Every structure is written in structure tokens, then in C-alpha cells.
């Protein structure tokens, strides 16, 4: 067995190597093509979608269906798209009950467009396709988002189309035929007059989460196969000063575009520590604009200028932890008052402390808690009893970890006959479902302690999963 002792610096992100970088004034500058640095795959896909040789007028993008993401995509498309000199669409001449369509002479015609990029989160039929209104015998035609995006790009949330299938069927027909036909939204109430169709050409970017994209693929398998696909990457792997610079510029850009203060040189270390808590990995930092914006919105009241320093960030994080910390404090009180029994001194046979990640539904913060695992061994037929599983409190992944641990022990003992003992393991004072395999190393140690009749030091806690060869594996959330 190899034992490697970790210093406290091994458990925190490396920020000392980038102190000179944090002090550079370039981090506060606006960078025109910030998306190409942090989202190169997405940037390339958008270029492909805008190309006249694109394989499909539709693009599927995996990203949260939030206004902030749609706005970011819209801004990126406007940067990539050359300014259009042509005018698309036209205008309708209405004389009594006669309506005629004429190509646009100028951009301010009612149904004229200049190839703009339009974003939409949730829309209804009238917002998307426009409508015909009649009042006191006078007819007016109202343009919709598709008319405003004529010659350009429509960025729309996928869930609004999945929830309203008729909207999708009509939008698909418009884009495929490059023509807009006026039809009644209610079949029982036809249009009072006939309205001539108009040419309409646009590209559509459908933005959705993984589940929405899966539902769309089931509904439109052929279109999903032909459409350009890309993803908004949630995080950035930090491997050198260049990637750290890209992340810092992304954070600064996100803050300034929302008119929020951005980090001062000494604040980056505090922000990065909070960022790795969010991602769960030391070398991975989030690109989620909602998370970034939240940090600066909360610290903004404490800032006096256009930047926020380390002291202000630390104060904001301490206030947030206190505000959200009621449940964590109550759990700690239960241990201190010995309502939950956790031994931190001495030695015990068949008992060990593990670490659990507690998540309460509706609570924004996950927190750690020590868990007491016990193992009892007795003469038997080789059965390993997982009490959590027997009581239907153990999940499938936890059961898998138990079976892997059992397989390792069988292989290690190399007995020529059936094991002459049975063992039972449990999480003591656990009254809710337990899942995950990150306790399998602690369970294995408790089992070996009980088998060998060797006590375990109770001042330590163990976490980590184990494979069939007995090797410790990394776990998240630390």
C-alpha cells in the first residue's frame, strides 16, 4: 500500500502562480471576441451556422434555457455576422378588404428587416408569427419575431416549442419553404380577408437542456441529424497562464456587461476558491454566466468603486454562509449535544468515521457531515449484509460499491473454500436514503478491522471509493 501525505496547499487551488497575471490591467479591458477564447467549439459552430453553405438552417445548442445565455448567443452572432446592407421583407398595402404585398423599399417599412439577430425565451403564437386585427372595419397587420428576424437569425428556447407543438410545426414550415403564410390560430375563426404570403428566410438556433434536446430528437429525428450541433461548455480547464487569463477575461467581461464591479487584483484568489467549490475540481473553473453574475450582484452593495477587493468578497461569502447555514449548524449541534454519536478519540474495532455530502431538497448549499460506519463479523456462510440495502435505504450505486468491496476481499483472501464468516455493515443513525460509492473505502476499512480484530483510530475520517483491486479512487465534492 502506498500512503501519500497531502499538505494543506494540495487541497486548495493554485493561485500563487498567477499573482502577476491578476495584477495585469489587460484583464479589465473589453475583448471583442471573448467567446472564441473560452468557447472555441461553440464559436466555430456559430460560424458554420451563418455560412451560406450550412447543411441546415437549424442549429441545436445544448445550453441552459435562460435569458442570460440567449443574450450572450445573440451578442456573439451579431459580432460574427457582417452588417447587412440589404433590406428583407416588405410592406402590405391595405385598401378596404384588399391586401397586397410589395417588396421593401426602405428599412422602416412595417414588415421590412435588415437581417437582425432576435432572441426569444418563452413566446406565444402572436408574438412569434404576428397577427391580423380588425377593429371597426379597419384591418391592421402586426409583425412577429419571425418578420423582425427576416434575413437574419432567430435564437429561441426549445422548451417553448416542445410545449406548443403547433408553433414548432409552423416555424419549421416557414423556414423550410422560405415563405410566410397568414393562417388563423383558431380553425373555428378563419381570417376575415385573404392575406398574400411574403418571402421570409431565416436561420434558427434552438437552445435547450439535454432533456429538451432528447425530446426534440425523438420528435424530429431526421432534422436533428442534419442540424448543426454544439454545446455551451460549463467550465474551463486551467492548465497554464493562458487559460487562466481567458477565464479572468470572461469573468470581467460578464461583470462589466451587466454593469457590475469586477475583481481587483487581490480578489481573484477569493473568487477562485469559491469557484472551485462550485465546480468540485481544483483545476476547473466555471463559465456559467448566471453563477458569475450572482457573485458580483451580491458583492456590489459592499463595493465603493468599479472594482471589489478581497475583503469585500470574503465578507459577502461569510454573510451568505451565515444566511444559508441554519441546517448545517443544527447538524453540528446534534453532534456536540451527543444526539448523533461521533467518536473522535481513542480506537474502536469495526467502527470508522466516513464523510457524507448532505443535500436537502430546496436548500442551495450542500455540506459535509461525518458518518459513523460499523461492521459486525460472526460465524456464518460468507454473506455480506448491507443493512441500508435490506432496509431499502441504499441506492444502486451504493450497492455497486458494496459488491466491488466484497469482490476485492474475496480475491485478496484467496480461500480454497467458502468464507466461514458473515458480516453486516451499516451507517449508524442514518434515517434517509444513502447513495454513492464514496464510502466504500471506509466500509472496507471497517470490515477489515472487524475481521482482523484490529482497532481503527477514531480521530480520522475516510472518504473515497475503491475498485476491485483495492485501489482508492477520487471522489467529487471535496
Could you tell me what each predicted segment is?
Residues 1-217, 228-240, 248-370, 384-394:
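Conserved ASCE/P-loop NTPase catalytic core
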Residues 220-226:
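Flexible glycine/proline-rich, aromatic-decorated loop/lid segments
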Residues 358-478:
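Terminal-proximal interaction/regulatory segments of ATP-powered molecular machines
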Amino acid at each position: 500500500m502506498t500512503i501519500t501525505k497531502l499538505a494543506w496547499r494540495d487541497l486548495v487551488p493554485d493561485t500563487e502562480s498567477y499573482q502577476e497575471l491578476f495584477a495585469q490591467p489587460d484583464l479589465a479591458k473589453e475583448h471583442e471576441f471573448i467567446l472564441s477564447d473560452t468557447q472555441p467549439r461553440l464559436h466555430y459552430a456559430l460560424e458554420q451556422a451563418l455560412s451560406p453553405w450550412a447543411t441546415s438552417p437549424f442549429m441545436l445548442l445544448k445550453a441552459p434555457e435562460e435569458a442570460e445565455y440567449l443574450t450572450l448567443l445573440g451578442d456573439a452572432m451579431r459580432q460574427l455576422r457582417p452588417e447587412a446592407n440589404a433590406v428583407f421583407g416588405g410592406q402590405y398595402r391595405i385598401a378596404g378588404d384588399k391586401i397586397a404585398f410589395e417588396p421593401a423599399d426602405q428599412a422602416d417599412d412595417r414588415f421590412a428587416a435588415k437581417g437582425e439577430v432576435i432572441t426569444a425565451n418563452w413566446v406565444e403564437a402572436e408574438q412569434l408569427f404576428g397577427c391580423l386585427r380588425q377593429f371597426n372595419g379597419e384591418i391592421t397587420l402586426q409583425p412577429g419575431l419571425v418578420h423582425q428576424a427576416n434575413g437574419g437569425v432567430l435564437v429561441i428556447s426549445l422548451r417553448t416549442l416542445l410545449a406548443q407543438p403547433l408553433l414548432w410545426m409552423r416555424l419549421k414550415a416557414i423556414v423550410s419553404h422560405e415563405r410566410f403564410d397568414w393562417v388563423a390560430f383558431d380553425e373555428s375563426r378563419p381570417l376575415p380577408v385573404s392575406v398574400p404570403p411574403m418571402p421570409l428566410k431565416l436561420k434558427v438556433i434552438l437552445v435547450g437542456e439535454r432533456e429538451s434536446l432528447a425530446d426534440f430528437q425523438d420528435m424530429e429525428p431526421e432534422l436533428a441529424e442534419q442540424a448543426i450541433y454544439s454545446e455551451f461548455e460549463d467550465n474551463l480547464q486551467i492548465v497554464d497562464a493562458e487559460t487562466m487569463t481567458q477565464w479572468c477575461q470572461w469573468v470581467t467581461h460578464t461583470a462589466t456587461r451587466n454593469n457590475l464591479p469586477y475583481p481587483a487584483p487581490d480578489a481573484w484568489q477569493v473568487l477562485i476558491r469559491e469557484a472551485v467549490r462550485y465546480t468540485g475540481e481544483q483545476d476547473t473553473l466555471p463559465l456559467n454566466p448566471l453563477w458569475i453574475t450572482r457573485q458580483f450582484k451580491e458583492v456590489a452593495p459592499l463595493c465603493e468603486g468599479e472594482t471589489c477587493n478581497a475583503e469585500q468578497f470574503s465578507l459577502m461569502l461569510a454573510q451568505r454562509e451565515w444566511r444559508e447555514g441554519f441546517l448545517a449548524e443544527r447538524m453540528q449541534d446534534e453532534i456536540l449535544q451527543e444526539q448523533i454519536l461521533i467518536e473522535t478519540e481513542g480506537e474502536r474495532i469495526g467502527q470508522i468515521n466516513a464523510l457524507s455530502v448532505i443535500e436537502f431538497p430546496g436548500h442551495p448549499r450542500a455540506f459535509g457531515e461525518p458518518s459513523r460506519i460499523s461492521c459486525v463479523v460472526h460465524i456464518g456462510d460468507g454473506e455480506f449484509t448491507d443493512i441500508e440495502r435490506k432496509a431499502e435505504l441504499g441506492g444502486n450505486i451504493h450497492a455497486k460499491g458494496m459488491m466491488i468491496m466484497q469482490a476485492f476481499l474475496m480475491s485478496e483472501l484467496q480461500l480454497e473454500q467458502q468464507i466461514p464468516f458473515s458480516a453486516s455493515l451499516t451507517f449508524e443513525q442514518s434515517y434517509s436514503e444513502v447513495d454513492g460509492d464514496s464510502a466504500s473505502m471506509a466500509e472496507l476499512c471497517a470490515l477489515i478491522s472487524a475481521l482482523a480484530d484490529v482497532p481503527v483510530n477514531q480521530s480520522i475520517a475516510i472518504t473515497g471509493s475503491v475498485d476491485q483491486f483495492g485501489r482508492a479512487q477520487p471522489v467529487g465534492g471535496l
